[in-house]
Amino acid sequence: MLWLSGCVSAPQSDALLTHFSQETGANPSVTLAARVHLEQVPFFPQEDFQCGPAALATVLQASKVDILPDALVSQVYVPSRQGSLQVEMLAAARRYGRISQILAPDLEGLLEQVQAGKPVLVMQNLGLSWYPQWHYAVVVGFDLPRGEIVLR
């Protein structure tokens, strides 16, 4: 039997944390707080393969749209893909009067949005580069001294 274990982090995460001073709680070149948590953002547990509707309902409710994940399933979930496509997620948000802003894949920019009180819907690969397992989640906070990002 072969057991493998490992831990990796992205270069942008390492760079941000390297420049962040735990002693002062701030980095002179980055205007990020040490800790932020958007506690008012709702949480919806997901059904199997339903991370898209759950994550989208989370950000829509945070922007004052009264919607539940079940109401979004028919709009964004593609059964043959066992998931939701980005284009469907963007279109559904627009149907509810919300225009999504696509962010560059930059950790600092993402954290700045969260610090500004905006939860960020992210698509993350929970698998491997050669065998991806895509998953939607919502970033609702961070703790830079601990190197943690809070997801719903």
Question: Could you describe each region identified by the protein language model?
Answer:
Residues A55-L60:
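Buried hydrophobic packing segments
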Residues C51:
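Active-site-proximal loop/helix segment associated with metal-binding centers of metalloenzymes
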Residues W3-G6:
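C-terminal motif of bacterial Sec signal peptides marking the signal peptidase cleavage site
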